[in-house]
Amino acid sequence: MQKTTFVKNEAALANKKWYVIDASNLILGKLAVEAANILRGKNKVDFTPNVDCGDYLIIINSDKIVLSSDKADREKWYTHSGYIGGLKEKSGRLMIEKYSDKLIYGAIKGMLPKNTLSRYLIKKLFIYKDANHKQAAQKPMEIKLN
């Protein structure tokens, strides 16, 4: 009878890879799903839910992301300062133009599990607004998404 194998922390640390995704003309939700799976390690054969077996991920050209359908005009993002009358509202178009990195970060973070492990997973995510990134020394492999 074949037994289930689990990955140890030491083995998971040895198998970390670096990936880069170009976010140009990609839909936000589809990008976030793929990114969360890579960060979590679900694309690997030896996935273990309680071990950080995911890889590092770099997302470039975040300002060229696309929201599906008419969400750029219809959806609103809200922040509150904590003071009376401190509610601020931002449209999807403004979020893409000015805060595209925070938009992608929030979408990916929302798709990770809500536990202690997710704090370690989200630290392996690097988002840049243009094509230049600081992790060239790690020789990241490029992933093409449709």
Curated annotation (Swiss-Prot):
PROSITE patterns: RIBOSOMAL_L13
Pfam families referenced in this protein's UniProt entry, alphabetically: Ribosomal_L13
Disulfide links within the chain: none
GO cellular component, one term: cytosolic large ribosomal subunit
Molecular function via GO: mRNA binding; structural constituent of ribosome
GO terms classed as biological process: negative regulation of translation; translation
Keywords: Ribonucleoprotein, Ribosomal protein
InterPro entries membership: Ribosomal_uL13, Ribosomal_uL13_bac-type, Ribosomal_uL13_CS, Ribosomal_uL13_sf
Keyword Ribonucleoprotein in record: yes
Keyword Zinc: no
NCBIfam families: rplM_bact
Quaternary structure and partners: Part of the 50S ribosomal subunit.
Function summary: This protein is one of the early assembly proteins of the 50S ribosomal subunit, although it is not seen to bind rRNA by itself. It is important during the early stages of 50S assembly.
Family: Belongs to the universal ribosomal protein uL13 family.
HAMAP family per UniProt: Ribosomal_uL13
Protein name: Large ribosomal subunit protein uL13
Organism: Malacoplasma penetrans (strain HF-2) (Mycoplasma penetrans)
Classification lineage: Bacteria, Bacillati, Mycoplasmatota, Mycoplasmoidales, Mycoplasmoidaceae
